[in-house]
Amino acid sequence: QAGALFLCDQVIPWDYGSCSAYEKLEDGSYGYVYHKGPIEAFGGNEEYKYSAVREYLGQVAEEWEEQGYQMKNVRTGRTYTYTGQTKERSFEQFSEQDLTAHPSSYQQMTDRVFLLSVEEAIRYRDELWKFSGMDWLRPASTRYWLRTAMGREGGEGTGQAYAVDLVKGCIAPVDVGDTCGIRPAFVVTQAASR
């Protein structure tokens, strides 16, 4: 069955679900304690398969299905890592040659709600910087993760994944412990035309 890709029209800010609460501290005194939200960092390494953002999107998929959304499972396994970055202020006019693909060990996995890969970002480049409203301008949502790891020739393990930078107008690697928002995507099954 054919499907239509939907890319959320807003970035979920990296501080979503984060809060400071006035609590009793270990020493018995009271003070503010910061609690991280579910997507404050990509994860412990550049592997989307085991990332905090993928875990969160799995929960989102379950919630959406309970609300009646019928989303397709999409192959989100990695076949490539990338090196390089697009030029700042190039936005959707970036050159694909600035990003170099490197074959990677294949990961078998599917998701119903997911982040775009670098390959998909290239394919849907005209949509990467389009939004409804101006909410993305707040500091916690000025860039959003892609699911592709930054690699290196001959191996992985860089501790970086790619992100779309909305202010600088580029696609670039970011340390996985750094803060980026997320822009979920999903595919809805389309009925065959008659």
Label for each model-derived stretch:
Residues 1-194:
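Collagenous Gly-X-Y triple-helix signature in extracellular proteins
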